[in-house]
From Swiss-Prot:
It is an enzyme of class 1 (oxidoreductase). This is Tyrosinase. GO terms for cellular component: melanosome; melanosome membrane. SUPFAM superfamilies: Di-copper centre-containing domain. Cu cation A binds at residues 180, 202, 211. It holds the Pfam family Tyrosinase. The chain crosses the membrane at residues 474-494. It comes from the Eukaryota. Residues 1-17 form the signal peptide.
């Protein structure tokens, strides 16, 4: 009944975030390299007549890149989105969207002036109706074609530079699976050759801001699809977990008793078909994923390579990550040491902070542990546990931001791997967002986490803690300095007093001080003339 009711709401709401807007998938838009669709409210491009935005040239960052990608002009994702479009909508004030038809995160209302703060909650804190609604929303998104977005099934070159558009419809859920595939896929070099050392959303500084935006857009899509403006993605707090406690039919799907690699027939997700999971096949054909179904969702939690991932992350691991003061370091990739980002992502040891190519920990550990569809980066978003997992990873990122209050320039401006500089536009989003745009507190984007709200009184203490620790380290020096200072002050005071007394005794009467010494002052009698 709930699912049927949700379907009835579908065409009452329009989506506003994703990859290629349907309105910009024509040969005219591609050959003119312009994506400035009209806003339905006034019929003008980008809602210009209503002051919502205007069509403007895309200004690309010229900051130098790291050495990881030695090519130029071979990948459609380079200098995003310039291969496809060099003019897009630039929205004003709190407006957002490919046609400036929606509001920035954290705002709502007809003029996007009303602030709002949504709260992401632990999935185990949801009531049964709330949990069932969440599962139904995911199922609806999986089976509803995106009204506003399509996915390209060929490169720009394969489209004859835009004259022969190649696009397919895709469901709301699979749109995000496709985006995660597209951002992390290998570069196609021709003749079955590929370049693998490239990823516009992982293994570099943009990992956390990119996934922050990704979840916000996914959340927003489901809000608009269902008409539930208060929907938020729940999180799974996997600290100290001994097994996959969300892997039950009540939640994200239990194990199939007949085949441990499949989900239980009683699960919401056992009938789901996955997409974009066959990277090597696409590479051999020099093709892109076209959204075709590729079989059932696979998951066999715990039966993974335990030499690479001995256990799930602990509370101590998380605390160590949060103790790392540097967001990024060194080469700014998966070899970075003492980098908060690299340690949280799982390429560095959460005990030492040293990069270790033989181990997968923290964020990576959960992907490996699931031992199935979620364990391969490009297609990992097929598994809905991806949402719960990345919501919790994002909450750890939020803890770090609140602890250190970094300025924007803490995020690297230059020399990061391709696509990861601060001013680089994030692939493959249209409208456009820069990496640095989401190096901000979640509250600035209109959401919070329930368990961080509970610890709100400790935020001030966290803020001053580094200063208190510094004061504690220099306390012995301060005491010693105070003692020496007191002795010097007493000696100098005595010498000054002695010199002043001698000088006073030598002064003529008219230059004697009006007040006498303390012992003489007490001998004076106030005499009245009355």
């Amino acid at each position: 009944m709930l699912l049927a009711a949700l379907y009835c709401l579908l065409w009452s709401f329009r989506t506003s975030a994703g990859h290629f807007p349907r309105a910009c998938a024509s040969s005219k838009s591609l050959t003119e390299k312009e994506c400035c669709p009209p806003w339905a409210g006034d019929g003008s491009p980008c809602g210009r007549l209503s002051g919502r935005g205007s069509c403007q040239d895309v200004i690309l960052s010229t900051a130098p890149l790291g050495p990881q990608f030695p090519f130029t002009g071979v990948d459609d994702r380079e200098s995003w989105p310039s291969i496809f479009y060099n003019r897009t909508c630039q929205c004003f004030s709190n407006f957002m969207g490919f046609n400036c038809g929606s509001c920035k995160f954290g705002f709502r209302g007809p003029r996007c002036t009303e602030r709002r703060l949504l709260v992401r909650r632990n999935i185990f804190d949801l009531s049964v109706p709330e949990k069932n609604k969440f599962l139904a929303y995911l199922t609806l998104a999986k089976h509803t074609t995106s009204p506003d977005y399509v996915i390209p099934t060929g490169t720009y070159g394969q489209m004859n530079h835009g004259t022969t558009p190649l696009f397919n419809d895709v469901s709301v859920y699979d749109l995000f699976v496709w985006m995660h595939y597209y951002v992390s896929r290998d570069t196609l070099l021709g003749d079955s050759e590929v370049w693998r050392d490239i990823d516009f959303a992982h293994e570099a500084p943009g990992f956390l801001p990119w996934h922050r935006l990704f979840l916000l857009l996914w959340e927003q899509e489901i809000q608009k699809l269902t008409g539930d403006e208060n929907f938020t993605i729940p999180y799974w707090d996997w600290r100290d977990a001994e097994n996959c406690d969300v892997c039950t039919d009540e939640y994200m799907g239990g194990r199939n008793p007949a085949n441990p690699n499949l989900l239980s027939p009683a699960s919401f997700f056992s009938s789901w078909q996955i997409v974009c999971s066959r990277l090597e096949e696409y590479n051999s054909r020099q093709a892109l994923c076209n959204g075709t179904s590729e079989g059932p969702l696979l998951r066999n939690p715990g039966n993974h390579d335990k030499a690479r991932t001995p256990r799930l992350p602990s509370s101590a691991d998380v605390e160590f990550c949060l103790s790392l003061t540097q967001y990024e370091s060194g080469s700014m990739d998966k070899a970075a040491n003492f980098s908060f980002r690299n340690t949280l992502e799982g390429f560095a040891d959460p005990v030492t902070g040293i990069a270790d190519a033989s181990q997968s920990s923290m964020h990576n550990a959960l992907h490996i542990y699931m031992n199935g569809t979620m364990s391969q980066v490009p297609g990992s978003a097929n598994d809905p546990i991806f949402l719960l997992h990345h919501a919790f990873v994002d909450s750890i990122f939020e803890q770090w931001l609140r602890k250190y209050h970094p300025l924007q320039d803490v995020y690297p401006e230059a020399n990061a791997p391709i696509g990861h500089n601060r001013e680089s536009y994030m692939v493959p989003f249209i409208p456009l967002y820069r990496n640095g745009d989401f190096f901000i507190s979640s509250k600035d984007x209109g959401y919070d986490y329930s368990y961080l709200q509970d610890s709100e009184p400790d935020i001030f203490q966290d803020y001053i803690k580094p200063y208190l620790e510094q004061a504690q380290r220099i306390w012995p020096w301060l005491i010693g300095a105070a003692v020496v200072g007191s002795v010097l002050t007493a000696v100098l005071g005595g010498l000054t007093s002695l010199l002043c007394r001698r000088k006073r005794n030598q002064l003529p009467e008219e230059k004697q001080p009006l007040l006498m010494e303390k012992e003489d002052y007490h001998n004076l009698m106030y005499q009245s003339h009355l």
